[in-house]
Amino acid sequence: MECTPEFWRANLELWKILDVDYNSDFNDTFGSDYFEPNITLEQAINLEGPGLNHLARSGVAAYLDSIVNPYTDVEILRESVHDNNIHALDAFVSLYSENMNK
């Protein structure tokens, strides 16, 4: 299952089922220090635009997707976001999508 940031932002009640608090700190979740002041996972998934906002929004959606799919390596995902590597994150999401469609 690959869900969009739009899906996850519209279904905050599902985060609780996954045992994810949408008020959790983005920087703590991904071991990064991108946002000052800190933002929550919910704020991150609601960000608009390219660059770091895209990384944060897509990273949170992929993180939630990775909890749904037990075959996903959450650490690779976290490292991609931590390293601000949007290309690695995009590759991760593409590979994840291919595996889910098999």
Locate predicted features.
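Soluble extracellular-acting proteins and domains
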Residues: 1-102
